[in-house]
Amino acid sequence: MTGISFNLPDDDAAPAPVLPAADDVPCDGWWPGVNLGALRDAVRVPSGETERLRDAVRQAMLDIAGELAAWRADQVAAGYAKLADVPGRIVVDGKSDYELRWFRAVYSVVAADVGERAVGPQLSSAGADRLEALRADVDVHLRNVAFAVRDFLGKPRIVAEAL
């Protein structure tokens, strides 16, 4: 008689997918890097044109890191080696509010950049009716950038429209 034995898993949770390291865009070791696959899923960026997306991520990281440079300097002076070491004001799903808002800001800059490219000169007359919807999407992403940065810094949100 032959038999097969196996151990049942401890829980029914599926293991987290392993994303390829080649899709990672690191950011100087202090700020968290961005995985292009996770970004595509989060902001519904179509696959393809990976190098353009990588460039958009690099530029977004530079933009947001620049806006948060003074805050970072204060944290480094306080002895924190990276953003993940800074105690969050609140932790959601195992991530600090700082980490979540960093990713929201970077992802929103990328989404706005991708949206602006879609609105660019290659837009045909057949797609002109989508122009306003695309512009509205870009505006929402830019608003999300501003909100994420202000929330990160603990500043109140400001919404103003030109009349």
Language model region names:
Residues 94, 98-163:
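Short loop/turn elements at secondary-structure junctions
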